[in-house]
């Protein structure tokens, strides 16, 4: 409460010192209620409670013509609440046009112009937006890329003198060629999808869409047939399902290269993903809502909104977004069920979450392997290893020995056996996994760690750990393992170097903190050791068995030390 009061006082000082809205110039234009609502809105806005922020901003709309900061926040809040059309109207209907001079305002006006097929206006607004190109990291990319798109839409050709933004520009060129019906469009799709500099698998959907739109059905079937349900994204799994069931028209219902709004919508979705990857979920949702405004038919993109809200623990909003996914599109419906189960786990615990998921799963007549895989992972995370093993076994028996997915499933099942103490079965699965994929750092790490804990094949375990570390030297779990290996052979100085790094990378991991405490104790740094053991007790996800052991160590120290 005190912090909120400080924020209000600071905001008041700024507010009265703003030339556009000074006390002497315009204090009589509003009343104390406007001020109260405005500053309440600021507090809600700063606390990322956008729904409340918008409620307070709506109650003080008299300020939209008088205070630049207010207008920016009000417009931003409107878009976050998916009221894009209202946000556009607020900007367009301002008496004072000077206070609409900010980046998001121009992007909204561009979106409005595209919606109305007014490419000339869109170009004018994009030119204006460039004055803010250095204000935020992605502003230049957004303005320049939109400029290239609008040029193609307006002039029916590709802009020759343009800025290059690497692979982002390759994506833009691909869609521009698709829109202009260039003969080499297919080659651009193939080159992008096979690009080794990143994961561009999403664009397989758009390639299939392009093939269907151009009546190349057999080629579309061939591409879809190469997709594996179990390791494909939701969008690609749904695409393969549509192809297998002859639902070719579904593709054009949600996207068409002939529609400029659909193309720009996809670009804005890409921007949203960029922000989401940096944990900037508000800006991600801002651009995602603009994307949805231009192409409301691509409801599958709302899965990113649901993920963003989930990461912010806004579960009520997640539930609302999930209502967009129904049983007709089975993979997105399954995404909905999983996300609902995850929220139940967060709110009520694993037992209730697993019960909900298994009940929904059992009602599915012919569950896909991807669904079986997901429920197996849920059971494994819930420490219900027997159930997890049963589901993993169902999938493993259906896969070829050459399949990389079989290697991964054997690794997961082997880990489940290890947790149950069935080391013979665990070793069998993990070794089988490594025969398929000898360079899998995680399988190497898991098996080596298990052997070290059992004081079994120490030299071979060390060799496996060194191989895993060479492949994944920045992975904190592998760093922890190799550090713990040195601990187990009494090389505490070397062990400390690795565990210190692991703690720096995973400061809230109970096992890593526990290990580091043990090593510090052996190095006679006992005060520091107890500090890290106490850390373990402060973590919400620390197992009860670990807590009991830590409490003993804090009192008695390490035995035999």
Model-derived segments and spans:
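Residue-level recognition of tetratricopeptide repeat
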Residues: 42, 76, 111, 149, ...
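Alpha-helical adaptor scaffolds
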Residues: 79, 179, 338, 342-345, ...
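Generic helix N-cap/helix-start motif at coil->alpha-helix transitions
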Residues: 29-37, 64-71, 98-108, 121, ...
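Terminal, low-structured helical/coil segments at or just beyond the last alpha-helical repeat
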Residues: 255-257, 261-265, 510, 515, ...
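Sec-dependent signal peptide recognition
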Residues: 3-11
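N-terminal leader/linker segments that initiate helical-solenoid repeat arrays
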Residues: 17-74, 80, 88-89, 100-101, ...
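Structural motif corresponding to the intra-repeat A-B loop/turn of tetratricopeptide repeats
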Residues: 47, 81, 116, 154, ...
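Alpha-helical repeat scaffolds
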Residues: 54, 58, 84-97, 119-133, ...
């Amino acid at each position: 409460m005190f912090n909120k009061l400080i924020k209000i006082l600071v905001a008041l000082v700024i507010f009265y010192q703003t030339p556009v809205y000074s006390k002497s110039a315009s204090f009589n234009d509003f009343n104390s209620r406007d001020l109260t609502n405005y500053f309440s809105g600021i507090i809600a806005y700063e606390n990322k409670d956008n729904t409340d922020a918008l409620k307070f901003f709506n109650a003080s709309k008299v300020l939209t013509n008088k205070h630049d900061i207010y207008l920016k926040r009000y417009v931003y809040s409107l878009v976050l609440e998916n009221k894009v059309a209202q946000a556009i109207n607020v900007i367009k209907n301002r008496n004072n046009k000077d206070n609409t001079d900010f980046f998001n305002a121009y992007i909204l006006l561009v979106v409005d112009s595209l919606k109305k097929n007014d490419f000339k206006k869109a170009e004018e607004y994009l030119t204006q937006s460039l004055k803010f190109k250095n204000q935020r990291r992605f502003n230049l990319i957004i303005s320049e890329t939109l400029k290239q798109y609008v040029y193609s839409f307006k002039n029916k050709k590709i802009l020759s003198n343009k800025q290059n933004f690497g692979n982002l520009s390759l994506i833009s060129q691909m869609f521009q060629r698709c829109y202009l019906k260039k003969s080499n469009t297919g080659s651009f799709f193939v080159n992008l999808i096979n690009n080794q500099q990143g994961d561009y698998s999403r664009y397989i959907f758009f390639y299939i869409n392009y093939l269907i739109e151009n009546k190349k059905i057999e080629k579309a079937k061939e591409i879809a047939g190469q997709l594996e349900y179990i390791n494909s994204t939701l969008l690609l799994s749904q695409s393969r399902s549509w192809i297998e069931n002859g639902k070719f028209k579904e593709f054009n219902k949600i996207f068409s290269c002939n529609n400029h709004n659909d193309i720009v919508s996809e670009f804005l979705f890409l921007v949203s993903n960029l922000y989401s990857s940096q944990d900037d979920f508000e800006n991600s949702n801002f651009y995602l809502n603009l994307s949805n405004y231009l192409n409301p038919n691509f409801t599958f993109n709302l899965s990113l909104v649901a993920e963003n809200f989930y990461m912010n623990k806004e579960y009520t909003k997640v539930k609302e977004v999930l209502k967009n996914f129904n049983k007709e599109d089975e993979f997105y419906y399954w995404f909905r069920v999983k996300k609902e189960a995850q929220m139940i786990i967060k709110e009520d615990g694993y037992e209730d979450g697993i019960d909900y998921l298994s009940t929904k799963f059992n009602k599915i007549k012919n569950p896909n392997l991807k669904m079986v895989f997901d429920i197996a992972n849920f059971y494994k995370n819930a420490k219900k290893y027997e159930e997890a093993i049963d589901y993993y076994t169902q999938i493993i028996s259906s896969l070829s020995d050459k399949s990389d997915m079989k290697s991964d499933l054997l690794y997961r099942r082997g880990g489940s056996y290890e947790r149950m103490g069935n080391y013979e079965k665990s070793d069998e699965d993990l070794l089988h996994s490594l025969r398929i994929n000898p360079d899998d750092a995680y399988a190497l790490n898991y098996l080596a760690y298990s052997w070290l804990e059992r004081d079994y094949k120490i030299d071979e375990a060390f060799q496996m750990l060194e191989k895993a570390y060479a492949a994944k030297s920045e992975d904190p779990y592998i760093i922890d393992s190799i550090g713990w290996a040195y601990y187990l052979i009494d090389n505490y100085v070397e062990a400390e170097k690795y565990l210190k790094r692991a703690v720096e990378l995973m400061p809230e991991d109970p096992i890593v903190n526990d290990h580091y405490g043990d090593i510090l104790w052996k190095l006679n740094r006992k005060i520091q050791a107890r500090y890290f053991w106490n850390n373990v007790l402060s973590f919400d996800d620390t197992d009860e068995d670990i807590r009991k052991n830590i409490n003993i160590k804090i009192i008695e120290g390490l035995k035999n030390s």
